[in-house]
């Protein structure tokens, strides 16, 4: 018997976006490089290798987010205990909306995500570290 999915990903993303702060790309660009802001790249490592990286961004795979934020987790990353603003992004802004909502529910603040994600970042001509060279 097939599964009956009652809430699709789009509804989850829309609900998250009603709760969280979404930064237009122009605002994200103005925050880049500030000492009190941490950009958190939640894309998969293969995406980073394929598409490039935002200079200075902290990479936190989406699957580890809750474990890295929680100070009681054996996987906690101290960066998430710092008194900073956390700006999440993925490729298009869907996963980062959900990640930002989760971080906010966990008590991390202030948090936001970038509208359009890394795709919007690249389209705006923002700085990127190029993708790793393909292996021969």
Which residues are covered by each model-predicted region?
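Short, surface-exposed ligand- or partner-binding patches at beta-edge/loop junctions that are enriched
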Residues: 89
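Active-site flanking residues adjacent to catalytic metal/cofactor-binding acidic residues
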Residues: 40
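Rhodanese-like catalytic fold shared by cysteine-dependent sulfurtransferases
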Residues: 1-37, 45-85, 94-136
